[in-house]
Amino acid sequence: MKRKSERRSSWAAAPPCSRRCSSTSPGVKKIRSSTQQDPRRRDPQDDVYLDITDRLCFAILYSRPKSASNVHYFSIDNELEYENFYADFGPLNLAMVYRYCCKINKKLKSITMLRKKIVHFTGSDQRKQANAAFLVGCYMVIYLGRTPEEAYRILIFGETSYIPFRDAAYGSCNFYITLLDCFHAVKKAMQYGFLNFNSFNLDEYEHYEKAENGDLNWIIPDRFIAFCGPHSRARLESGYHQHSPETYIQYFKNHNVTTIIRLNKRMYDAKRFTDAGFDHHDLFFADGSTPTDAIVKEFLDICENAEGAIAVHCKAGLGRTGTLIACYIMKHYRMTAAETIAWVRICRPGSVIGPQQQFLVMKQTNLWLEGDYFRQKLKGQENGQHRAAFSKLLSGVDDISINGVENQDQQEPEPYSDDDEINGVTQGDRLRALKSRRQSKTNAIPLTVILQSSVQSCKTSEPNISGSAGITKRTTRSASRKSSVKSLSISRTKTVLR
């Protein structure tokens, strides 16, 4: 995350907001039009002021605001910035939401600002407008108790609009998530205990999300970690951070992780995790693709029977990893595909890419029904008739269309082979390289050099590991549950968002 000191310029005077939506700065007398027009309609280039509370205001301004004794303007556009992969630009991550909420609360409680209107303003950049509105909306949902719809209605008052968020894939995009999707995700995360800022560990989040410190994020506290794929040995080559299994072992033990699930080709020997006492499972499918029904079922079965938390990785820990964790969330928490994608990206930006988005929409109804049956069975309400009715219900959702995406029967792809990823640069390689490059102290290293290093390491990683095609499951656990290696850099033990 890039953070710059908040600008503290002395701008000339403007009184506080006096209306929900205005095409002029507050306090400036608005000239009434003789024509009978909708007073909420505005020109796209008009300044907009939206009252959040009697003291807090959100503004979209196309010129620099002027300060006054009774108003305090501030902007986070250059302070809390999204670190993009390609054309993606948001939503901002969980740490930035936390920082923003702390900033607002501090300003509202400040003795020197008790008589001032607090105006959070953003400029003409539509991407920054969307992220600023996202932060304001999250604050309304988390701290003001507004429903997602109430927060969204305030932000779109006067026909104000915001561009939707897209994925981190290279090229065009045909699937988007909206501010309302994000607000619903945050609300449900609070409802289900995923989000609790009273115990949020900001330092831990910002430390471990960096490529050099492990590149991991909790998606569901105490249940799911998404992390980048380990290599056979830890090293830094051409600005590209590679971590061995031993980098993660102590952290995983401290946080009750019992199960590791690998979705990409073998770049380390699973024995290095199993000898340390972890269960390890391999569920391979191609980088950038969607999982088969068999893989989804196997993943859910593993997670539902895991004794503790589950750590999931592919190459970058974004596409395949985010997709399968999203399947679990949709099944067990009945969140929509869009809400789930929004939440996973708020926790770990860049997650769920390309066709994986439509795949989740297609699977939504089926996963909800499976979740209903799962919960019914846990309550002891299952019987033969219920099971038969449920099976019939599931068989009827194959051609259901959700948001224009049809759930059609498709031929299962051929089993995935490790060789598919060995000889070329895949999407995961590019995303990992981009993240390593932008977070390294020097950005002077060409991306092609980092990618070349990554591919070479793939070809030489663990050459003696026996290959396997299709879905391979490994569930060995060391009898002694001992580890002969030490963590390279991880020392913190507090769980994020308990």
UniProtKB/Swiss-Prot annotation:
<feature type="region of interest" description="Linker">
    <location>
        <begin position="199"/>
        <end position="212"/>
    </location>
</feature>
<dbReference type="GO" id="GO:0006470">
    <property type="term" value="P:protein dephosphorylation"/>
</dbReference>
<dbReference type="GO" id="GO:0005634">
    <property type="term" value="C:nucleus"/>
</dbReference>
<feature type="short sequence motif" description="Nucleolar localization signal">
    <location>
        <begin position="1"/>
        <end position="54"/>
    </location>
</feature>
<feature type="compositionally biased region" description="Low complexity">
    <location>
        <begin position="485"/>
        <end position="498"/>
    </location>
</feature>
<feature type="compositionally biased region" description="Polar residues">
    <location>
        <begin position="459"/>
        <end position="469"/>
    </location>
</feature>
<dbReference type="InterPro" id="IPR044506">
    <property type="entry name" value="CDC14_C"/>
</dbReference>
<feature type="region of interest" description="A">
    <location>
        <begin position="44"/>
        <end position="198"/>
    </location>
</feature>
<feature type="compositionally biased region" description="Basic residues">
    <location>
        <begin position="474"/>
        <end position="484"/>
    </location>
</feature>
<dbReference type="InterPro" id="IPR016130">
    <property type="entry name" value="Tyr_Pase_AS"/>
</dbReference>
<protein>
    <recommendedName>
        <fullName>Dual specificity protein phosphatase CDC14B</fullName>
        <ecNumber>3.1.3.16</ecNumber>
        <ecNumber>3.1.3.48</ecNumber>
    </recommendedName>
</protein>
<dbReference type="GO" id="GO:0005730">
    <property type="term" value="C:nucleolus"/>
</dbReference>
<dbReference type="GO" id="GO:0006281">
    <property type="term" value="P:DNA repair"/>
</dbReference>
<keyword id="KW-0234">DNA repair</keyword>
<feature type="region of interest" description="Disordered">
    <location>
        <begin position="459"/>
        <end position="498"/>
    </location>
</feature>
<feature type="active site" description="Phosphocysteine intermediate">
    <location>
        <position position="314"/>
    </location>
</feature>
<dbReference type="GO" id="GO:0032467">
    <property type="term" value="P:positive regulation of cytokinesis"/>
</dbReference>
<dbReference type="GO" id="GO:0000226">
    <property type="term" value="P:microtubule cytoskeleton organization"/>
</dbReference>
<feature type="compositionally biased region" description="Low complexity">
    <location>
        <begin position="15"/>
        <end position="26"/>
    </location>
</feature>
<dbReference type="GO" id="GO:1904668">
    <property type="term" value="P:positive regulation of ubiquitin protein ligase activity"/>
</dbReference>
<comment type="similarity">
    <text>Belongs to the protein-tyrosine phosphatase family. Non-receptor class CDC14 subfamily.</text>
</comment>
<dbReference type="GO" id="GO:0005737">
    <property type="term" value="C:cytoplasm"/>
</dbReference>
<dbReference type="GO" id="GO:0030054">
    <property type="term" value="C:cell junction"/>
</dbReference>
<dbReference type="InterPro" id="IPR050561">
    <property type="entry name" value="PTP"/>
</dbReference>
<dbReference type="InterPro" id="IPR000387">
    <property type="entry name" value="Tyr_Pase_dom"/>
</dbReference>
<dbReference type="GO" id="GO:0005654">
    <property type="term" value="C:nucleoplasm"/>
</dbReference>
<dbReference type="GO" id="GO:0072686">
    <property type="term" value="C:mitotic spindle"/>
</dbReference>
<comment type="subunit">
    <text>Interacts with FZR1/CDH1.</text>
</comment>
<dbReference type="GO" id="GO:0004725">
    <property type="term" value="F:protein tyrosine phosphatase activity"/>
</dbReference>
<feature type="region of interest" description="B">
    <location>
        <begin position="213"/>
        <end position="379"/>
    </location>
</feature>
<dbReference type="GO" id="GO:0060271">
    <property type="term" value="P:cilium assembly"/>
</dbReference>
<keyword id="KW-0227">DNA damage</keyword>
<dbReference type="InterPro" id="IPR003595">
    <property type="entry name" value="Tyr_Pase_cat"/>
</dbReference>
<dbReference type="Pfam" id="PF14671">
    <property type="entry name" value="DSPn"/>
</dbReference>
<dbReference type="GO" id="GO:0007095">
    <property type="term" value="P:mitotic G2 DNA damage checkpoint signaling"/>
</dbReference>
<feature type="region of interest" description="Disordered">
    <location>
        <begin position="1"/>
        <end position="45"/>
    </location>
</feature>
<dbReference type="GO" id="GO:0007096">
    <property type="term" value="P:regulation of exit from mitosis"/>
</dbReference>
<dbReference type="InterPro" id="IPR029260">
    <property type="entry name" value="DSPn"/>
</dbReference>
<feature type="domain" description="Tyrosine-protein phosphatase">
    <location>
        <begin position="214"/>
        <end position="374"/>
    </location>
</feature>
<dbReference type="GO" id="GO:0000922">
    <property type="term" value="C:spindle pole"/>
</dbReference>
<dbReference type="InterPro" id="IPR029021">
    <property type="entry name" value="Prot-tyrosine_phosphatase-like"/>
</dbReference>
<dbReference type="GO" id="GO:0005829">
    <property type="term" value="C:cytosol"/>
</dbReference>
